[in-house]
Every structure is written in structure tokens, then in C-alpha cells.
Amino acid sequence: MIKKIWFLVCVFVCGVANATVDTSLVERAEKYLNSITGLVGGFVQTANGRDERGDFAMLRPGRVRLDYANMPIQLISDGDDLYFFDKSLDQITTVPLTSTPAGILVRKNIDLHNADINVVETVDGNNSFSLKMNLKGQEGLGYMTVVFDKKPVKLNSWSVDDATGAKTDVVFNNLKTKTNFGRDYFQIQRHKTISTSGGDDFYD
């Protein structure tokens, strides 16, 4: 499961041929995402038929935190990098936030027509709609689909598919707005010293 979590962190792209894109749905998603400052709630992650639950928080620009209930794992972004923290080993692995699914959702200005983002497919359902996305420069590794409830528009879930067809779903629940977090909430607390503060053009 930890391997699947790491895949969820890293993979975010793939082309989809002959798909249709409804620009009005893209604009609705973009408007909603730009209206969010902070969220907290729960999540259920499903991979290989196994569920893992935990707590989710985000604060734009650039901050994300996922705490897994039954594993010693945290994912925390400080606005620059995303840290995969294995508490049992007191070990941190770092990737640029811009290369992850979460990075799209917490940019300072979310522009889904940005040169580095491709919305390759939209699906309009009765109660929800979804956007399938990829990032340029990482084609062939997988793709991400973000699902939004319609009435009112709000984040429902995201899923990541790799090139082999393996899928990881993250469904959010009980999401509420929140902007007042503790000063160190989006920083890792560990035995060894590491700087977890920074930023870049997307998140400053």
C-alpha cells in the first residue's frame, strides 16, 4: 500500500485519444478551485481492493496535508515540495509539488488552460462532472481524473491511473472550509532536522 501511495504522489500524466472537452465544465471547475482558500475533511483511498482512511487538509496557495489513520505515513506540502514522511523509519522523500496531482489544486492562480496542463477529457453526469488531466513532459506515465459534485460545485474525489492500468482512488468526505491552521501545521515534525518551508511561482 505504501508503494501505491508513493505512486499517487508521483504520477500525473497520459494522453487520451479522441476524447471530448466541454470548456464550460473546465471553467466551472476552475472557478470553484480558485474560490477555495482552505479545506479540511476525511478521505478514503482505494488501491488493489484495499481501503485506507485518513484526514485531509489544504490551504492555498501550496499547502496540503494527508494523515493516514492506520499507517505511519504523512504527506505534507509546504508550498514548495511535497514530503512523503514514513514515521516508522523517520525517513522523508521529497518531490516537487508541481509534479503531483495535489499541486494543481493548490496553485495560487489555478489556470486549467495553462501551458503545462492539458484537460484531455470531460464527462458530464447527472450529479457530478469530471476532468481528466495530464501534464506536459511526463506523457505515458498515467493520468489523473478529478470529480466534482454539481449542486453545489465542490471537490468529490480524484483518481490516478498508471500506464499498466493500475488505479488509485481518493474520495473525500465531510469537507469543510477552514483557513485558520497552526503555524507549523503544514510542516513535518521529526527527530532529524529538515527545512520544510519554501515556495515557487505557482504557490507564492
What do the predicted segments below correspond to?
Residues 1-4:
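Positively charged n-region of N-terminal signal peptides that target proteins for export
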Residues 14-16:
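N-terminal signal peptide c-region/cleavage motif recognized by signal peptidases
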Residues 19-27:
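Cleaved targeting-peptide boundary
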Residues 31-49:
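A short, Trp-centered hydrophobic/proline-enriched beta-strand micro-motif
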Residues 36-38, 51-53, 59-61, 70, ...:
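Extracytoplasmic
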Residues 40-42, 57, 65, 83-84, ...:
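Soluble periplasmic/extracytoplasmic beta-strand elements of cell-envelope proteins
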Residues 55-104, 168:
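An acidic-aromatic
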Residues 113-122, 126-198:
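Gly/Pro-enriched, hydrophobic low-complexity segments
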